[in-house]
């Protein structure tokens, strides 16, 4: 295995593009779920929003076991000729895509209510807690094996975000244009079209995963860990590792903010403003801005000022934009789109560098303990992200229920006002909490990261 790694070509553009396609594949199913699953089950399947949110929240808590378990499996697995992490991408790309497609079966809309809730729960568990976990944790852990250079890892983080952004453009632009139809002057979702969309995106996900597997190479040998760590020990370590705790808290609120905005977009644009086309335009413009502004400059700004410092500044900017939107309450949909794009810039910088921050946390843990456990730490972080998903799903579903959202009241003025308020207040609170977590919990500023990199380099050179 070590000889094969030595023969691998130097880190380059193939690795960046390949890693980008990995997250492109992830987000063909993840973003579809984040943006349209709630809308599909409330408006097409006729399931109460609070129940949908509760089912999604319960499913995410199941990940407390599957994420950590998968991290342990990855850490204990032995490297093969394809590496330690890459083989999982090839093994699991089919199951995760099929499970995602099964979630969106509009042909079951006429089935009994209990059956539909059970179908959502089972398929959502299969997709998110089992198959998505089994491909996403090895994929994320793989970054530290592709290169040992922190600059290369920062570039991988940037390209990963580009992949996510491109997926967001495809899903965010194409889905509203195809999935929504006008019935009696109202913009509503077509169930049959959503089923077709889910099938197409599942095929696209498989193709992206294959490209990722083919183009990337692992160069840093990560031996199989012989240490057995219990789930309780792992979660205990969170509270003795400030860096891990800080990034976990920040990650929960990043997802809470981002996914709440994404989920509510399916209600803000068609219900508040009556324009599904504006949702497509907002996704397109948000993607363009992300690619032009955030992706090219995030790594450079992080290298100059520090990742933590950039994340704090960008989060403050996003919170301020949503506060302005809440006070302004634009009558035109394009005013809301403008606020969304400006807030997206701030969030985009953070999202671009957050994956590189995880490798900083892994390095910090190795400096302190002498043990490198990429898969375990990444799995705990992944679980934190899914907590953010769970809280977002539960929050959106609960709040929609509180304001009285149903198929019958979807366009009532009181309901649409509530939708708008939720779309602004949730990200304001989320970004403020991100800033507090990074300032008071996360210790890895620019100076500390550079010290850790130097310490690890000295250890490896002495062997």
Specify the residue positions occupied by each region the protein language model found:
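Membrane-embedded alpha-helical bundles of multi-pass transporters/translocases
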Residues: 2-463
């Amino acid at each position: 295995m070590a000889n094969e790694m030595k023969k691998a070509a130097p880190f380059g553009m193939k690795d960046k593009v390949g890693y980008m396609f990995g997250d492109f594949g992830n987000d063909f199913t993840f973003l579809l779920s984040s943006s349209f699953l709630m809308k599909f089950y409330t408006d097409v399947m006729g399931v109460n929003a609070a129940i949908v949110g509760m089912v999604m929240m319960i499913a995410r808590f199941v990940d407390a076991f599957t994420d950590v378990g998968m991290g342990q499996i990855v850490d204990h697995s032995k490297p093969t000729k394809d590496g330690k992490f890459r083989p999982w991408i090839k093994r699991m790309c089919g199951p995760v895509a099929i499970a995602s497609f099964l979630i969106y079966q509009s042909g079951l809309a006429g089935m009994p209510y209990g059956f539909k809730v059970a179908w959502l729960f089972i398929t959502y568990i299969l997709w998110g807690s089992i198959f998505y976990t089994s491909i996403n944790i090895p994929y994320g852990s793989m970054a530290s094996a592709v290169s040992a250079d922190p600059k290369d890892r920062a570039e991988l983080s940037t390209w990963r975000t580009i992949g996510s952004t491109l997926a967001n453009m495809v899903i965010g632009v194409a889905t509203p244009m195809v999935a929504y139809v006008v019935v009696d002057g109202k913009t509503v979702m077509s169930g049959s079209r959503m089923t077709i969309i889910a099938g197409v995106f599942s095929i696209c996900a498989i193709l992206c995963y294959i490209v990722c597997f083919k183009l990337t190479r692992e160069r840093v040998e990560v031996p199989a860990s012989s240490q057995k760590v219990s789930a309780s020990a792992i979660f205990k370590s969170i509270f003795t590792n400030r860096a891990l705790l800080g990034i976990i808290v920040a990650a929960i609120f990043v997802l809470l903010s981002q996914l709440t905005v994404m989920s509510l977009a399916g209600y803000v644009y068609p219900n508040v403003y009556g324009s599904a086309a504006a949702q497509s335009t907002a996704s397109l413009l948000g993607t363009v801005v992300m690619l032009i502004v955030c992706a090219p400059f995030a790594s450079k700004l992080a290298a100059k000022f520090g990742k933590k410092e950039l994340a704090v500044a960008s989060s403050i900017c996003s919170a301020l934009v949503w506060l302005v939107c809440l006070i302004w309450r634009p009558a035109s949909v394009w005013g809301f789109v403008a606020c969304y794009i400006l807030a997206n810039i701030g969030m985009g910088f953070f999202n671009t560098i957050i994956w590189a921050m995880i490798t900083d946390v892994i390095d910090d843990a190795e400096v302190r303990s002498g043990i490198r456990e990429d898969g375990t730490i990444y799995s705990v972080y992944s679980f934190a992200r899914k907590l953010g998903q769970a809280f977002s799903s539960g929050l959106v579903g609960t709040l929609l229920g509180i304001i009285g959202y149903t198929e019958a009241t979807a366009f009532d003025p009181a309901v649409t006002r509530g939708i708008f308020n939720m779309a602004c207040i949730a990200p304001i609170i989320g970004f403020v909490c991100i800033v507090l977590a990074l300032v008071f919990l996360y210790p890895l500023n620019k100076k500390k990261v550079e010290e850790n990199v130097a310490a690890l380099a000295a250890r490896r050179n002495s062997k």
